[in-house]
Amino acid sequence: MQGKINYKDITQKEMFNEIFKEYVKEEKQIDLGTCDQDSVHDLWRRFVKRWNDGKMKSKWYSLGKRISQPSYARLVGPSRPTLENLQDRRELQEQLNELRKLSRKSAFKSQAKRETELLDEILPKEPAGSKEAMQQKKKEKRAALKHYREASDNEEDLKETDLYGDRDSFQSRLKQKKQRSEFRASKREMERLERDQELRNKIEERNKKELETIEKLRELAKARLQGFSS
């Protein structure tokens, strides 16, 4: 089992700082940069307790084992790092970067799932089980996943709300989308009514012309009959 941490030891806190930050971000969805000093201290105390109780995932202990090695510990002091020290640090940084990437992907999937659920609640629904309903759900889900895949490709531009969700902002966008959808539906209905009215006008105009033609034929026939009888 990984050696225990003394949460009052400043040197150990500095050594485990990167793991601590990544653990809090991945496991608790908390960015230490947004926390005050008291909150950070409380999170560190909880982190140390869980670590010492052996209740963390093995990957955290694997990282801890690396930084606990003497070669890494010497990097904390003022002495000049050796090539071996730098290699250890690069390998540790690569592992931390991989953890960050996995954390982001997990956050993307969770947010996409939440947005899909909100879409199901807010958007007009086709009859349950219908082909249209299934297609609509797939379409909206693909759109949500596409948004977060694109965000994942531009990690440097990400904000915390992109990773962990701004529910009010998303609901506002959904409301606007629903309003646009309703407006388009209303516009289509108005256009349909106008087309129907135009068709009715054409039919009435054609019927009127046919009646006028029939009336003229009747008058012509009547005139011919009168000519025969005279």
Curated annotation (Swiss-Prot):
From which residue to which does the signal peptide run?
none
Coiled-coil zones? none
One Gene Ontology cellular component term attached to this UniProt record is: nucleus
* Xref: InterPro entries: SCI-1-like
In this chain, composition skew of type Basic residues spans 136-146
Q: Where is the composition biased (Basic and acidic residues)?
A: 160-170, 179-195
Region (Disordered) residue spans: 118-195
The record's annotation in PANTHER family points to: STYLE CELL-CYCLE INHIBITOR 1 (PTHR34117:SF1)
This protein is called: Uncharacterized protein C297.06c
